[in-house]
Amino acid sequence: MTQSPIFLTPVFKEKIWGGTALRDRFGYSIPSESTGECWAISAHPKGPSTVANGPYKGKTLIELWEEHREVFGGVEGDRFPLLTKLLDVKEDTSIKVHPDDYYAGENEEGELGKTECWYIIDCKENAEIIYGHTARSKTELVTMINSGDWEGLLRRIKIKPGDFYYVPSGTLHALCKGALVLETQQNSDATYRVYDYDRLDSNGSPRELHFAKAVNAATVPHVDGYIDESTESRKGITIKTFVQGEYFSVYKWDINGEAEMAQDESFLICSVIEGSGLLKYEDKTCPLKKGDHFILPAQMPDFTIKGTCTLIVSHI
């Protein structure tokens, strides 16, 4: 049983739309000049992160979940529930839909559904996202996709650093070029591409689309994901609540000074996206820097964070 923060070593994924921002911004060693994703806190079979410190050093997060459920407050479930990513969107990502739990369970061999959310760490001027569509029925959705009426179909939204978007399963969506994003999502890789700008993969073939599944899984008409943001300030910290939903709750902690904290959840997932500081508990001190990702376990004692830094924090 551990009462210490559990730091994770990320896994990186090359993507046709990726770049070098994960290296340039966070100092990571990335596999190529087209690195799109950092699976920062992951217990997904396609890319589990590894414990970097303490008594469980060297174990994957999958192994830790399976062998030491007490670390996570005894939370039930076959699969660790969440996945935290950093996304370097140098070029447009594909337009896609993710299924809900029921559809994924029926069609994706045990995958969870995929509700997700985005925190915009940084973006270029006039950057945007695709969030939803204008179709009023599935018949109209099919017609507009088949005719390539993307301008008429897609809802485009301008974004800026600090924005937050909740993306429920069934939402037609895409991140567009020029964005650096922290994504919190259900622990799933179920994705149905609708359109990919006719790009070719590394073998020179068009990337696979999943038209029928995407239409089946899509929410029609579009419904915006509901968020109810609030802000609380006290000595040393400002906490912004972005969403408290069925699958996860997500917050931003802005530390400026020294903040006293308590860990009251089954576990907390933490990512340092800016600045540096010290996490102190009992007689121990852990340095924190931009690009660190860690879990605060169920048995974590009260602690303080001292410094100037920003964290995105989530729990189930």
Swiss-Prot record:
Binding locations of Zn(2+): 98, 116, 173
Domain of life of the source: Bacteria
Cofactor note: Binds 1 zinc ion per subunit.
Alphabetical keyword list: Carbohydrate metabolism, Isomerase, Metal-binding, Zinc
The UniProt record lists the keyword Isomerase: yes
Known EC number: 5.3.1.8
Family annotation (InterPro entries): Carb_Metab_Reg_Kinase/Isom (IPR051804), Man6P_Isoase-1 (IPR001250), Man6P_isomerase_Firm_short (IPR014628), MPI_cupin_dom (IPR049071), PMI_typeI_cat (IPR046457), RmlC-like_jellyroll (IPR014710), RmlC_Cupin_sf (IPR011051)
Pfam families, sorted: MPI_cupin_dom, PMI_typeI_cat
Keyword Isomerase: yes
GO biological process: carbohydrate metabolic process
Active site, per annotation: 193
GO molecular function ontology, one term from the record: zinc ion binding
Catalytic activity from the UniProt record: D-mannose 6-phosphate = D-fructose 6-phosphate
Cofactor(s) the protein needs: Zn(2+)
Protein family: Belongs to the mannose-6-phosphate isomerase type 1 family.
Name the record gives this protein: Putative mannose-6-phosphate isomerase YvyI
Native species: Bacillus subtilis (strain 168)
Taxon lineage: Bacteria, Bacillati, Bacillota, Bacilli, Bacillales
